[in-house]
């Protein structure tokens, strides 16, 4: 419906080395695996839609891959929005802020080459997939993070470089932001469930779940001992104070809408944490894969 096939056909008419490979599974891991297995070169690079790439993206990453002796390299992924309004600019800022996305280096920016636990998209030597395996086809999301953790677990090296960048076009409505992060949160739990490796993800991926549980669990157990409800109140007060302080500073320093900043942070954190909680509750009903 988005003219993908037509667009690819236009490119193949000009560049005959481009090939379109069908992916009936309609999720990322099988698509990547089909592409990797069909590849003929020494370097694999993943480029996702809804993103744009700097003109030197290819050359910088391929050079860094060999110069650094890395198994995977990537660059900072800047966040932007297509339609710039007070709401979308607030969402953009929240998705680039440490209070929004944690210590996610590739989102918050770097000024030097760093070894990291994951990078967006990726640039690998082809033989890396022979050594560490292909994408895990069970994972609808987080498949890139899981692959990178597997590489590190096997003694590999992942680097992020500052000399190029890509730009991700973020969701522009609160409903779309919530839907996306609900799915991310849910698949954090399912990723650990299917891989049986807690370190398939990082601690930051579970902070929203901890926040949501800090609100819900004390209230549930307060039926047995009512003072426990105060823990929920304290958690909410602490979050509100932190949220208000950070949003106020961003509003003043970057001239952004205070209310939209508040709403963006809350939607991001609560939808992500709620998704993780739903994922946790769904574990007894998950099929074995």
What do the PLM-derived regions correspond to, one by one?
Residues 1-6, 25, 48-52:
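A conserved acidic beta->alpha catalytic loop
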Residues 5, 9, 28-37, 148-149:
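Short, conserved alpha-helix that lines the donor NDP-sugar binding/gating region
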Residues 20-39, 60:
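Glycine-rich, basic loop-to-helix element that forms the pyrophosphate-binding segment
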Residues 44:
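Short aromatic/hydrophobic "clamp" motif used to bind/position activated sugar donors
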Residues 56-89, 93, 165, 169:
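Conserved donor NDP-sugar-binding/catalytic core segment of glycosyltransferases
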Residues 79, 102-127, 139-140, 146, ...:
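A recurrent flexible, glycine/aromatic-enriched loop bordering the glycosyltransferase active site
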Residues 81, 136-199:
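Catalytic donor/gating beta->alpha subdomain of glycosyltransferases that bind UDP-sugars
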Residues 210-285:
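Membrane-embedded multi-pass helical conduit in multi-pass membrane proteins
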């Amino acid at each position: 419906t988005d003219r993908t096939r037509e667009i690819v056909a236009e490119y193949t008419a000009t560049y005959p080395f481009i090939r379109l490979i069908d992916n009936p599974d309609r999720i990322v891991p099988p698509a990547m695996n089909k592409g990797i297995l069909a590849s003929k070169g020494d370097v694999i690079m993943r480029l996702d839609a809804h993103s744009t790439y700097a003109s030197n993206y290819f050359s910088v990453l391929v050079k860094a891959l060999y110069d650094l002796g890395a198994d995977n390299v990537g660059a900072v992924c800047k966040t932007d929005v297509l339609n710039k309004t007070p709401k979308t600019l607030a969402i953009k800022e929240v998705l680039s802020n440490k209070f929004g996305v944690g210590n996610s280096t590739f989102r918050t920016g770097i000024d030097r080459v760093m070894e990291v636990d994951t990078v967006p998209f990726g640039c690998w030597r082809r033989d890396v997939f022979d050594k560490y395996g292909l994408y895990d086809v069970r994972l609808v999301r987080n498949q890139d993070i899981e692959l990178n953790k597997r590489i590190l677990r096997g003694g590999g090296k992942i680097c992020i470089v500052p000399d190029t960048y890509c730009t991700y076009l973020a969701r522009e409505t609160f409903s779309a932001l919530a839907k996306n992060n609900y799915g991310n949160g849910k698949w954090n739990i399912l990723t650990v469930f299917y891989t049986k490796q807690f370190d398939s993800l990082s601690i930051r991926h579970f902070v929203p779940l901890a926040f949501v549980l800090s609100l819900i669990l004390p209230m549930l157990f307060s039926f047995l001992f009512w003072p426990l409800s105060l823990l929920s109140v304290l958690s909410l007060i602490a979050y509100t104070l932190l949220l208000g302080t950070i949003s106020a500073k961003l509003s003043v320093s970057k001239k952004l809408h205070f209310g939209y900043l508040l709403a963006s942070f809350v939607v991001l954190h609560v939808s992500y944490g709620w998704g993780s909680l739903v994922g946790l509750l769904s574990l007894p009903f998950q099929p074995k894969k």
